[in-house]
C-alpha cells in the first residue's frame, strides 16, 4: 500500500499501543509456567501474533478474552509441532523461540520471513552449540534438535543484539543446572536485558547480575503462573512524540515514565532540543518550540534513530546521532534509509560507520521508500504530515508493531490518502 500525506498540523490526544517487547516476553514466560497465566492488555500486532502462533504450534493453549482485553495461557503443555513454525518478520520471536525450543525434547523448525532472513543469528547459534544443542540455519529455516540442557556456562558477545542474551535468559530456568551467562563485551541495549529480568521476576524467577551486566546467573527453578500487565510502548510512541515537537501540542497516554524501556529517553532528547515536555502518571505532553541541534548517543535506544532523525531535520544546527551502527541490521539498513529519506526531503545528511550527522533545515515533501520497515514508515509519516506532498511506499508495514498508526495520525488531523 502506498499512502500520500498532505500538509497538516496534527495535534490532540492519543493512547499508544501496548509494548511489543513486554508482550512477547510475557507470552514466552507464561508458556513455560505450570498452570494458567493471563496477559493483560497485550499488543495484537504482527510480531506478537507471530510469537503467539509459534507457541500455539508447540501445544500451548492461548485464548483471547476480548471483554477483559487479555490473553489466557495454560503453560508447559509443549508437544512436538506438526509442521514448521512461522516467525513472520519477528526477530524476537525467532531468537527467543530458538532458545526455548532448544530445551524441548524434539525437533523444531522455525521459518523466517523475507527480511528476517537477513538478520544475524550466528551469535545465538554459537551460544547454543556451547550448551550442546544441535541447531543450524538452512535458508530461511532454523532447525533445532532440542533436549535436556546439562551444561551451565555460556559466553557470547553483548554488543551485537541484546535479544541473544534475553533468549538465553528466558530458557535458563528450565536448564538442569540453570545458566551462567558471560558477555565478552559490554551489552548494547542494556535496558532490554533489564526488561527481560523484570519479566522473569514477574513469573517468580530469580536472576542475578553483575553491576556491569556482563555476568548473569539464573539458577534452575520453575516459572510460576502470573497475571502480567503489559505497559505502553515507548518505541511506538516515538514518532508521535517527535510530531508533538515539530507540529502541534500532543498529549499521549499509556506511557509509564518510570519504565525500564530504553526509548523513554526520547522525551529527554526532545527537552534538550527545546521542545516543551510535560509528564504525569501514565502520560506525556509534548509541545513545539524552536528546536536546536542535539548530540545523542543511541547505543541503548537504537530504535529511536528514525524518530529522532526527523526531529533533528527540523532543528537549527548540526545534530550528531551516535551509537547507531547496529541500526544497519534492523528490518532495513536504517542508517541508509533515514539518510536517503531526509536527503530526498532536502536535508543534508552524512553517514558514518557509527554516526549520522544531520544539518537541520526546512524539509520538503518527497517520495519515501519505507523499505518495508515499520519505524521508517512511521517516522517519515509523522514528518510527511507536516511537510505535505509526501508519499510513502509499503505503508502497511506498520502492522508489525502499530497496526492502526495511520488511523491514529488521521484522528489527530493528519491528511492521509491511502492507495494512491
Swiss-Prot record:
GO cellular component, one term: cytoplasm
CDD domains noted in UniProt: EPSP_synthase
Protein EC: 2.5.1.19
PANTHER family membership: AROM/DEHYDROQUINATE SYNTHASE, PENTAFUNCTIONAL AROM POLYPEPTIDE
Gene3D superfamilies xrefs: Enolpyruvate transferase domain
Pfam families in the record: EPSP_synthase
Transmembrane parts of this sequence: none
Active site location: 303
Protein's cellular compartments: Cytoplasm
Record's protein name: 3-phosphoshikimate 1-carboxyvinyltransferase
Keyword Amino-acid biosynthesis part of the UniProt annotation: yes
Record field: catalytic activity: 3-phosphoshikimate + phosphoenolpyruvate = 5-O-(1-carboxyvinyl)-3-phosphoshikimate + phosphate
Record note on quaternary structure: Monomer.
Protein residues bound to phosphoenolpyruvate: 20, 119, 163, 334, 375, 400
Keyword terms of this UniProt record: Amino-acid biosynthesis, Aromatic amino acid biosynthesis, Cytoplasm, Transferase
Main location: cytoplasm
Encoding gene, per UniProt annotation: aroA
HAMAP family according to UniProt: EPSP_synth
